[in-house]
């Protein structure tokens, strides 16, 4: 398995994925508050590297979250997603963009129970289910 001991080790590993590497290289252009790459794109890349696969193998999408409590509208979230998909349209992967500040507005309808509003992206990430190896 890939030896990851520091944040720098993780970033070096993720940059071996040419798609994530480009997103990270241009992350200032994402220009969203409290924004993070999260979930399967990270786990899949690390799994791939640890098992001798190309870093991009099996990636279906890239999840990018942000936290903007000042605009909880679906329209703003959709607009950011369109902008970022256009920015990275040359990459052969789907980009999913979500405002974690608005998750509580739709969570109950989708999952059957209500949640409290998150306080930050880190607060939201702390509730993510553990990822299973591919």
Question: Which role does the model predict for each range below?
Answer:
Residues 22-31, 45, 49, 83-91:
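Generic non-transmembrane alpha-helical segments
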Residues 42-44, 71, 102-105:
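Short, catalytically relevant binding-site loops at active-site mouths
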Residues 1-37, 42:
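Helical scaffold of the NTase/Pol beta-like nucleotidyltransferase catalytic core
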Residues 81-128:
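Conserved catalytic core of two-metal-ion nucleotidyltransferases
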Residues 129-133:
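A conserved mid-domain beta-alpha-beta active-site/ligand-binding segment of alpha/beta enzyme cores
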Residues 47-77:
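Catalytic metal-binding acidic patch
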Residues 32, 59, 92-94:
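Short secondary-structure junction motifs
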Residues 38-41, 67, 99-100:
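Short His-Asn-centered micro-motif
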């Amino acid at each position: 398995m890939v030896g990851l001991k520091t944040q720098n080790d993780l970033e070096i590993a993720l940059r071996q994925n040419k798609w994530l590497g480009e997103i990270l290289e241009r992350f200032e252009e994402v220009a969203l508050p409290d924004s993070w790459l999260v979930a399967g794109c990270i786990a899949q890349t690390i799994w791939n590297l640890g098992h001798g696969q190309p870093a991009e193998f099996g990636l279906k999408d890239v999840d990018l979250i942000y936290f903007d409590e000042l605009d909880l509208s679906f329209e703003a979230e959709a607009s950011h997603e369109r902008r970022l998909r256009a920015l990275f349209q040359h990459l052969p992967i789907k980009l999913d963009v979500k405002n974690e500040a608005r998750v509580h507005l739709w969570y109950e309808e989708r999952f059957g129970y209500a949640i409290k509003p998150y306080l930050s992206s880190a607060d939201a990430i702390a509730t993510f289910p553990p990822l299973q190896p591919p």
